[in-house]
Each structure stands twice: as C-alpha cells, then as structure tokens.
Amino acid sequence: MRWNKKNVISLVSKSHHLPAPITPPLPEIYRIPNPPPKLPEISIPPTLTLSPSPKHSNFVNFLENNLPHHQTLTPQTLLGFLRSKIRNHPLYAHYDFAVFNWAATLDTFRHDHDSFLWMSRSLAATHRFDDLYRLLSFVAANPCPCSSGIFSCPELEPIFRSAIDAYCRARKMDYALLAFDTMKRLIDGKPNVGVYNTVVNGYVKSGDMDKALRFYQRMGKERAKPDVCTFNILINGYCRSSKFDLALDLFREMKEKGCEPNVVSFNTLIRGFLSSGKIEEGVKMAYEMIELGCRFSEATCEILVDGLCREGRVDDACGLVLDLLNKRVLPSEFDYGSLVEKLCGENKAVRAMEMMEELWKKGQTPCFIACTTLVEGLRKSGRTEKASGFMEKMMNAGILPDSVTFNLLLRDLCSSDHSTDANRLRLLASSKGYEPDETTYHVLVSGFTKEGRRKEGEVLVNEMLDKDMLPDIFTYNRLMDGLSCTGKFSRKQVRML
C-alpha cells in the first residue's frame, strides 16, 4: 500500500472513530450500556487538519519508512511499530489510536488480545478517556479476537482492567462501573477479586464510603471472596473519615471470615489512631500485632515513633523502641535518627546516647545522621567528654564524621584545655581514612598555643607545611612565633593566630 495525502487524511479524519461492527446487531446483553447522563469534558489530543500541509507530507514519509505493508501487517508487527516508532515520537505519538483504527479496517488484518491490551493501557496511561470508551465499545460489540464466533472470553478481563483502573484513578467512577459491568458480562464468569478491589478503592479515594460499602456487599452476592486488600481499603476509608469504631468492626469481621490481617491492616489502624490523638489505642494495637505474630515493619515503627513524638511524648517513644528491642520484634532496618533528633532537641542528649548504646549493643547499628546528631546534641549541652567518647566509638565502628561536626568538637575540647584529647581524636580519624583539613590543624595549633604546649604545636605546623596547607612563609612564621611565645598571649590573641 502506498501512502499519500488521501490515505493520511482518511486515516486522520477517522482518528476518533472505530470501524462499524463487523457482525449483525448483537443481543442487548452484549452491548455496552449508554454512557452516564453527563459526559465529562475531555480534551481531545490535537489532530492534523484535513487540508494538505507540510505535516501531512512528513507523516506520509514517516509511515512509508516505518509501517509494514498492509498485506503483511500482523498484530505483532503493528505492536512493534506502535511501541518502537509511535509511542515516544515527539510529533506523532497521539496518532497511535488512529493507526490502530485504520488497521482494523483492513480485510487481511485482525487485532488480537495483545494489541487490544496495549491500546487500552496506552489510552489509559495518557488519560484519553473518550477514545478509551470507544475502544471498550468496539470490544463489546464485536467477536472476541480469539475467534469470530466467540463473544465471551476470560482473556478480555485484562483489557477492561487497565481501563477500570484508569477511570478510578481519575475519579470517573460512573465510567469505571460501566466498564466493570460490561467486562463481567463479556468474560461470562467471575472477575478477579483484584478488579473488585480497584473499584472499591476508587470509591474510597473519591470519598464515597457508602458506594464503596455497597460494592463490597455486591462482592458477597456475586460470590467473590474479599481478600486482605479489600478489607485494608475499607479500613483505610473509615480511618480517613475518623470512624474508628466502624474500622475496628470491619477488622473483627475480617478475622471472623478467616482473612488474616497483615502488616498493612495494622499500620492503617495504628496511623489512624495516632493521627487522631488516640495514643493508647494505637499503642495497644501495636502490641496486639505482636501477640498475633504479625511481623513489625520499618513503617510500623516510624508510625509509632512519629505519632508519640508529635504528641510531645518523646520519652514514651524511646521506651517503646527499647521495649520492642527487648521483645526482639524491632526491625533491623529501622532508622532511629529522628528519635535521637527529638531527644536532643529537648535537651535529653544523654538519654539519647543511652538508648543508642543499648540498641547498638544488640545489633541495631546507628546510621551516620543519628551519630552526628547525637555528637552535636552532646556538644551543645556542654557534655564535651561524652561527645568525644561517642565520636571515638563511632569511628572505631567505621562511621566517619563530617568535617564540620569533627572540627567543632575539637574546638570545644581545645577550649576546655583538652587539646591532647582532641589531637588523639585526629590521629584516630586519620588512621580510619579521615582527611583533616586546614581548620582541623588551626584549631589544634591554637589549642596547644593556649595550653603552652609548644612542642606538640610545632609538630602540627610542620605537618601543615608538608601537606601544603600554609599559603606562604608569613603564615608559617606567625604560627611558629605564636608557639614560641606560649603563655604570653591572652585567649583572644591566641584565637587570632
């Protein structure tokens, strides 16, 4: 087939219309119902005008160079063209449905399940809901791609499922229900419970719990067994609307029906309780989770800690974490850095250190941020020696500090006449791979100058010289002169060296 302007104009002019059904009118049961009374305003992707233009010529060349001849066109080769040539094209991506429709008009071509599924997903992903509706109408009004004599086929479910999901995400619940009912008739069987869950979740996200519950009840009438996801969706809906009694009733119903709650079920309830200030109920639910043998997740711990801290109960959060540790249910990946930050913010750095050491001792290695936060908290609260001891421990464990935290700690040690301890930390850090900078050396030299330790200071100045940290000889002489006059300067003068 040779592409020309007439072909292109014909293709584009039909870009919004699938070909007429290829079979006589079907019984009403197979027809998709009329759309909801009020059609939403849908923005249709721009198309080429019907008058010849340079764009037509470019599109002709594009099709001639990339689309297989119509006599050899198969669903697989068409899909290859749509995926590799059209899908990400900056100018022609929105013509995929037009090409899809054109192929359906060829006598030698018949779409299969894969091509319908790909087109359904493409239209859904790009929010072309009008075209998606037309595609589903065509599927409903024509025989199954399997055979021209089949109108009911379970393989049609994935085609409709992608559309239902897109409608639910866009809060177009009338269209989602329409597609669901049509799919249910066409597959001549019971849809997968996941499709029911999609519709239930759509109603919940739209804030319509009444319709969500009615659809859940419909599942029972249609003998579709709800799974844990079904209950989690509804529980989440009740929690979002602060109907915790109903959420707990559904939680109990879930267990009565033999559906075991999972970590998402508990997390949803715990988050709901804590966000509404029901601290005791949330913590109680967490301990019930332990009793039922449901594994704690990192998210569970974060929900509990954040909820308690938000209510100003930082000590309770700390105690809860340690209790979970003792019960051996605290996840190894739990990051308690935020709790350390809260404790330090309330001037409880020592409490934070005790908690961290207890966690560390039992295998809960702290992260870099938690360590530096604690060092800063101890330093700012005047507990320089404890900060130094913790810094030494973290470096021995291979956790190296950042230069700002490290230099500030050395400065505080030198200010309290512990320059030797500060230099010992520098040597330890260097042995672990940390590279001291100019600020590190200046802080230590100033500390030794103030304490009258000329020899130690000269060693550091010479190291600076060897590492090219001194910009000129004048700086070197100034530092050495300062060391030679140790004890003769005031503290302010030493800081100026």
Curated annotation (Swiss-Prot):
<feature type="repeat" description="PPR 2">
    <location>
        <begin position="192"/>
        <end position="226"/>
    </location>
</feature>
<protein>
    <recommendedName>
        <fullName>Pentatricopeptide repeat-containing protein At2g36240</fullName>
    </recommendedName>
</protein>
<keyword id="KW-0677">Repeat</keyword>
<feature type="repeat" description="PPR 3">
    <location>
        <begin position="227"/>
        <end position="261"/>
    </location>
</feature>
<comment type="similarity">
    <text>Belongs to the PPR family. P subfamily.</text>
</comment>
<dbReference type="Pfam" id="PF01535">
    <property type="entry name" value="PPR"/>
</dbReference>
<dbReference type="InterPro" id="IPR011990">
    <property type="entry name" value="TPR-like_helical_dom_sf"/>
</dbReference>
<feature type="repeat" description="PPR 7">
    <location>
        <begin position="367"/>
        <end position="401"/>
    </location>
</feature>
<feature type="repeat" description="PPR 5">
    <location>
        <begin position="297"/>
        <end position="331"/>
    </location>
</feature>
<feature type="repeat" description="PPR 6">
    <location>
        <begin position="332"/>
        <end position="366"/>
    </location>
</feature>
<feature type="repeat" description="PPR 8">
    <location>
        <begin position="402"/>
        <end position="436"/>
    </location>
</feature>
<dbReference type="InterPro" id="IPR002885">
    <property type="entry name" value="Pentatricopeptide_rpt"/>
</dbReference>
<feature type="repeat" description="PPR 9">
    <location>
        <begin position="437"/>
        <end position="471"/>
    </location>
</feature>
<feature type="repeat" description="PPR 4">
    <location>
        <begin position="262"/>
        <end position="296"/>
    </location>
</feature>
<dbReference type="Pfam" id="PF13041">
    <property type="entry name" value="PPR_2"/>
</dbReference>
<feature type="repeat" description="PPR 1">
    <location>
        <begin position="156"/>
        <end position="186"/>
    </location>
</feature>
